């Protein structure tokens, strides 16, 4: 999800596990990958891209460009998955891409809640500077929860947010949520990355929520 041509790594960050994708497709009348024959290249899919609500840090080289992150098109998503040898199918893209976009929008809304009260309104609000996928690297919290018997997240992202010039790191764990009426869901655990400032943000939020509940 970038305002210019996506590189291969950034194109392929889709926080949707195969089992969630398959169940979602089934609930929406789609076919499982095993039921669809391989489609030879080239595959023509929609190239339209959706503009996100996520503000982008604008640099001098970006002057005049869109100041919001832009999601990949169905064609870009398919090509990226093909390069990763994930055996994608064109029919899946119309479902996978909206899920990908919706999950990222939800993650940003959660970050905005964390950012409340930290002064970013004086410069127009926080902006997303960059993001990275770390699917193979468990966060300390996810590791502890797994030791206690909980499932591991199926993906992890690290987002770097610019708050009026201050870099604030966030971590996002993606979990399979419960299936409701045959439709699977995804649970996001969004929080500041563990650091001195991140720990202070967590304490600040917990304190506010605690006293807010007690005052009711």
Swiss-Prot record:
Q: Which Pfam families match?
A: Cyto_heme_lyase (PF01265)
UniProt record similarity statement: Belongs to the cytochrome c-type heme lyase family.
E.C. number = 4.4.1.17
Q: What is its main location?
A: mitochondrion
As its record notes, the protein acts as a catalyst of: holo-[cytochrome c] = apo-[cytochrome c] + heme b
Does the keyword Metal-binding belong to this entry? yes
UniProt GO MF annotations: holocytochrome-c synthase activity; metal ion binding
Region Disordered: list its residue ranges: 1-46
Provide the protein name.
Putative holocytochrome-c1 synthase
Read off the InterPro entries from this record.
Holocyt_c/c1_synthase
Q: Which UniProt keywords apply?
A: Heme, Iron, Lyase, Membrane, Metal-binding, Mitochondrion, Mitochondrion inner membrane
* Chain's role: Lyase that catalyzes the covalent linking of the heme group to the cytochrome C1 apoprotein to produce the mature functional cytochrome.
Q: What is the annotated localization of this protein?
A: Mitochondrion inner membrane
Q: Name one GO cellular component term.
A: mitochondrion
User: Could you provide one GO biological process annotation from this protein's UniProt record?
Assistant: cytochrome c biosynthetic process
